[in-house]
């Protein structure tokens, strides 16, 4: 989920309850995480996680990854299969390879704040729909990159330094509380975003289920279409695609838990 934590998964974990064993994978060594080149991050983490799961004696697993965690889950599944571990189910929730380079930090700050559950409007950001329109307009001019000042013309976003200060202060709760941890968390997030821009690797030999929030995400134009195209190419097996309520930043909850807990009817795939 970009932060290297399980924070966004908490509503889903509560909804799934205690009827099954659950294991969460998170970043515990920030320096080691940041030292991995972004273009190799997902594959490297996938190999490390697969090795750890195999070493722990697991020979059959279900995997779920959200946001950038979906890309890591994909690489973990590949490495597990190579080690003889059966991946019963690979579930991908609102995850994407960003198809352009993000040079405008304003979009990173918006996504960081939204991932933390902060009030983006109170921080000065426009509505997600307006932000998405501006992103699409900018990419129409330069499809491979979002320029450094692409969003500067939006109300409240001209002063990047002030915007960054507001977001980082809100992330720690006060001007000076936990500033080191807060700044490290932001660096982790930006590194994860850069990793999400890396070229797509070879496909996974198995099947997967993709869960797409109906409200989408302003980071990726034509969100549902983009995700479907990407993930169909990422798996050689079947790719079941299912819509869940909410937007990218709030789709992990009871509705998703119910979808995960029941067999998917064949007609739900497209």
Regions found by a protein language model. Name each.
Residues 1-270:
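A hydrolase-biased, glycine/serine/histidine/acidic-enriched motif that marks catalytic-domain neighborhoods
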